[in-house]
Amino acid sequence: NGALYAKMPYDMVKDFAPITLLATTPNMLVVHNDVPAKNLKDFIALGKKEGKMTFASSGSGTSIHVSGELFKTMTGIDMVHIPYKGRATAIPDLLGGRVTMMFDNMPSSLQLVREGKLRALGVTSSQRSPAAPDIPTIAESGLAGFEAVSWFALFAPANTPKAVVDRINALVN
C-alpha cells in the first residue's frame, strides 16, 4: 500500500490499469463478551472514561488496521494497535479478552457473533448488511461519516491494451 509504505517496488497508479471492482465486504467491530458496553455509543463512552484500549488487527496496513485507526481518530479514544500475523492469531486473544476489540471482515467473524462468542457493535459499510440486518452500521450508531470496507478489484499491467482491459471488464461484469 503506497499510502502506508514509502518504498514500494511498484507505483500503484502508474504501473497498473484498473479493470473492474469485483466485490466489497464490510468490516465489523467486534468485542469480547466481558466488555460491558452493549452498543457503540456506550463503547465510545467506556473508551473515553477508561483511557487506553487495545485493538487487534490481522496486520499493519490491512483494511482491518485502517478501520481501527479511523475509529481511533474519529472517536478520540486512546487506543493501542496490536498487529498480529493474520486473523488466526488475533482472534484467540480477542476471545480471551487480551485485546479489547477488533475490526474484522464481517464474513470471518459473523459465525462467532452468532454463536455468542463475540459481540458485534456495528458494521463499517454505509448500509446494514443483508447477511446481518440486525447489526447497525457504525454511522447510524452515532459516528456519522464512518465507512471502511474491504474491496477486491481486478487490475492489469499498465501497458495492457485498452481493448483487452475493456474486454475483460465486459466478461466480468
Where are these regions (language model features)?
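Beta->alpha turn/N-cap motifs
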Residues: N1, S58, R87, D104-S109, ...
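Hinge/capping helix and adjacent helix->loop/strand transition within the periplasmic-binding protein
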Residues: A3-T89, I138, W151-N173
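Extracytoplasmic "Venus flytrap"/periplasmic binding protein-like
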Residues: Y5-D11, D34, Q111-V123
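Small-residue (glycine/proline)-centered packing/hinge motifs flanked by hydrophobic/aromatic residues
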Residues: A6-V13, Q127-G145
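Conserved helix-loop-beta element of the AMP-binding
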Residues: A17, F43, K117-P130, E147
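Conserved functional loop/turn residues at catalytic and ligand-binding sites
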Residues: N39, P83, G97-R98, N105, ...
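Alpha-to-beta junction loops
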Residues: E50-M53, T75-I77, L95-D104, K117-A120
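Short helices/loops that flank or line small-molecule/ion binding pockets
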Residues: L70, M74, A88-R98, P107-E115
